[in-house]
Curated annotation (Swiss-Prot):
Reaction(s) the record says it catalyses: N-succinyl-(2S,6S)-2,6-diaminopimelate + H2O = (2S,6S)-2,6-diaminopimelate + succinate
Quaternary organization: Homodimer.
Keyword annotations from UniProtKB, A to Z: Amino-acid biosynthesis, Cobalt, Diaminopimelate biosynthesis, Hydrolase, Lysine biosynthesis, Metal-binding, Zinc
Positions of the catalytic residues: 83, 146
Residues annotated as binding Zn(2+) 2: 114, 147, 364
Protein name in UniProt: Succinyl-diaminopimelate desuccinylase
Highest taxon above the source species: Bacteria
Pfam families linked: M20_dimer (PF07687), Peptidase_M20 (PF01546)
Positions of Zn(2+) 1 binding: 81, 114, 175
Note accompanying the cofactor annotation: Binds 2 Zn(2+) or Co(2+) ions per subunit.
Organism from which the protein derives: Parvibaculum lavamentivorans (strain DS-1 / DSM 13023 / NCIMB 13966)
EC code: 3.5.1.18
Amino acid sequence: MTAPASSPASPYDPLDIAVELIRCPSVTPDEGGALGVLEKWLAPLGFKCERMRFSAEGTPDVDNLYARLGSGHPHFCFAGHTDVVPVGQADAWSVDPFAADIKDGRLYGRGAADMKSAVASFVAAAERISREGFQGSISLLITGDEEGPSINGTRKMLEKLAARNETIDHCIVGEPTSVEKLGDMIKVGRRGSINGWLTVQGTQGHVAYPHLADNPVPRLLEMLRRLDAHVLDEGTDHFQPSNLEVTTVDIGNTATNVIPGSARATVNIRFNDLHTGASLDKWMRGVLDAVTAEMGGSYSFKTSVSGEAFITEPGAFSALIAEAAKEVTGITPELSTTGGTSDARFIRAYAPVVEIGLPNATMHKADENTGVSEIRQLADIYETVLRGYFAGRAS
């Protein structure tokens, strides 16, 4: 298959769409008009656009968009988000974060890399395919809650689709997976992530009278030492070794002559598919119990799993995407599971999912930007994937 030529003169130039999206101040959880921009571009192509708004106690309400063209199978879905992280320190920017300035062949603005430009690229690719016709369905699953708690977005959209027996066959997520050059890395899985909050109880007292107090700090330090020293695994064929990091230690004591009454710490484990959140919770509690049995005292501990490890086994679907990237860019992408979590962790329970998007060097930074040519090339990659997919090359 020959890679399609970039089409900047097309009425669906992805740059135009990206500029419109970046000009929407959609700092999570605010929609900022971005979903309306997408509806404006998608509806004329025949996409049925459906707003999905979800709520949950203690979290902000979130607007999301599900747009589908066609009703049959195979059903190819693009998942992404239009919410962005806050600007941060405004004077660190050399441009207006929401002006979508173009300088020296690069598009600047919050969301340029993560990931409004990728959303724009897929819309442009879908327009090209829709003009020629295809057998099956194309959809976009766009959330406004990826950069936030991730409670009222992709996960609930997928649950709603499943409740009405609407299935997705394969999915691409447009996260910025590339490292140095467009197409040099795609994600075929992600590590899991579990946070743990530990509080060791003691008895506050004067440092001159330690026999009248109970210092929790030595017990906390021993617990953290044992957790940190343990080698969880050596990695697998597709994953790095699992890793625990102590992320905070807080005694809450500013006085030098007071033994604290409690000591707290948090830990995070990024883990591969040799573990689950439940198995790691059990292991950590075992370590804490052992220290408590030896040193006395008491503790409280809670955990939260933001995502389990998963892998989309290399096969026809990942090969289709890798080949499309190579055809357009000339680069053979690395199939990787590195990095943080993404909404692919929710999608993997419903369909095979692979992530491919723009270079990620400037995401979440001041002066976030991406190359104009890269936006158009990414549209070419997505178009090549869609052509191959509906030609049956994913199975």
